[in-house]
């Protein structure tokens, strides 16, 4: 893991397309501004993990539905 120190108003560049700017530091919270192309999804980590869990559940449900439909058409 790369660890960098930045002050309010300073930025970090990731590749050619993503810029993170420190907007404010308030106690133990850091407010970030993110400039990135629209096609790049940006989520808080807990939201990203919840989306991954829901996608995994949905794909399992789709597999089950396919099996049920196959059983019905085979009968």
Swiss-Prot record:
One GO MF term: mRNA 5'-UTR binding
**Signal peptide span:** none
Subcellular location per UniProt equals: Cytoplasm
One matching Pfam family is: CsrA
Q: Where is this protein chiefly located?
A: cytoplasm
Species:
Exiguobacterium sibiricum (strain DSM 17290 / CCUG 55495 / CIP 109462 / JCM 13490 / 255-15)
Function per UniProt: A translational regulator that binds mRNA to regulate translation initiation and/or mRNA stability. Usually binds in the 5'-UTR at or near the Shine-Dalgarno sequence preventing ribosome-binding, thus repressing translation. Its main target seems to be the major flagellin gene, while its function is anatagonized by FliW.
Q: Give GO terms for biological process.
A: bacterial-type flagellum organization; mRNA catabolic process; negative regulation of translational initiation; regulation of bacterial-type flagellum assembly; regulation of carbohydrate metabolic process
Annotated protein name in UniProt: Translational regulator CsrA
Please provide, in alphabetical order, the Gene Ontology terms of the cellular component aspect for this entry. cytosol
Which UniProt keywords are listed?
Answer: Bacterial flagellum biogenesis, Cytoplasm, Repressor, RNA-binding, Translation regulation
Query: Which InterPro entries does this UniProt record tie to the protein?
Result: CsrA (IPR003751), CsrA_sf (IPR036107)
Q: Give the encoding gene's name.
A: csrA
Q: Where are the transmembrane segments?
A: none
- Statement: the UniProt record of this protein carries the keyword Amino-acid biosynthesis: no
Cite the record's note on assembly: Homodimer; the beta-strands of each monomer intercalate to form a hydrophobic core, while the alpha-helices form wings that extend away from the core.
What's this protein's family per the entry?
Belongs to the CsrA/RsmA family.
């Amino acid at each position: 893991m790369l660890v960098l120190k930045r002050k309010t108003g300073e930025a970090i560049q990731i590749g050619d397309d993503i810029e993170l700017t420190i907007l404010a530091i308030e106690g133990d919270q850091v407010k970030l501004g993110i400039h990135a192309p629209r096609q790049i999804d940006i989520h808080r980590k807990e939201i990203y993990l919840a989306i991954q869990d829901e996608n995994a559940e949905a794909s399992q449900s789709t597999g089950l539905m396919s099996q049920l439909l196959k059983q019905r058409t085979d009968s």
